[in-house]
Design a protein with these regions (language model features):
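Alpha-helix N-cap/helix-start motif
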Residues: 13-14, 74-75, 115-116, 160
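Alpha-helical hydrophobic/aromatic positions enriched in membrane-embedded helices and signal peptides
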Residues: 35, 59-61, 65, 100, ...
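Glycine/serine-rich anion-binding loops at beta->alpha junctions
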Residues: 59-78, 109-115
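Short Gly/Thr/Asp-enriched flexible loops that form oxyanion-binding sites at enzyme active sites
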Residues: 19-20, 49-51, 71-85, 117-118
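A glycine/threonine-rich phosphate-anchoring loop and its flanking beta-alpha core
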Residues: 83-169
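ATP/NTP phosphate-donor binding region
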Residues: 1-62
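General beta-strand structural signal in soluble alpha/beta enzymes
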Residues: 33-34, 64, 74, 106-107, ...
Length: 169
């Protein structure tokens, strides 16, 4: 079974999303899709909400994440949480994950965060109002697909923000 995690902005604004859906059409019986809400930065609470739903899917083989840095972080973290029980916040910090997650394929639609190739995923801890990460060897994507055509659907403001993000790293 495959899980496609995609942010709503990609669904609304990218013709490439439809191409991916067409490519995966032959797997429709084993494909599940979750569209992430895009009204705020992802929090540990939201991560736990989505991970709770995903953990109920038996025999999940791979997660495909499509979107900006936050969506890619969600996809990577959900891969890890599928095999590591409990609330996500207990894995905050470095190398607190016990088991490797299931395989992931990350397709970024912005250039700058590099989330698809890092061992970090950042979420907001609402109790502290801070962005803190789950970091470590089990947080990297299995595969990253980089295609400049995906960047064409990125809004100008997001391109500017992610470009600045790349410069400050």
């Amino acid at each position: 079974k495959m899980l496609l995690i995609v942010d709503r902005g990609v669904v609304k604004n990218s013709s490439y999303y439809n191409k991916i859906k067409m490519l995966l059409k032959k797997y429709k019986d084993s494909l599940i899709e979750i569209q992430l809400r895009d009204d705020e930065e992802p929090s540990y609470d939201y991560l736990d909400e989505v991970a709770g739903k995903v953990r109920k899917i038996p025999n999940l083989d791979v997660i495909i994440g499509i979107g900006g840095g936050s969506s890619i972080d969600m996809a990577k973290a959900i891969c890890a949480l599928y095999t590591n029980p409990g609330l996500s916040i207990k894995y905050r910090g470095f190398d607190n994950l016990v088991s490797p997650g299931i395989p992931s394929i990350c397709i970024p639609t912005t250039a700058g965060t590099g989330s698809e190739v890092t061992v970090n995923a950042v979420f907001t801890d609402k109790s502290q109002m801070k962005k803190l990460g789950i970091n470590g060897r089990y947080m990297s994507a299995t595969y990253a697909i980089l295609d400049a055509k995906w960047l064409q659907s990125c809004p100008k403001s997001a391109s500017i923000s992610s470009g600045m993000d790349a410069l400050v790293h």
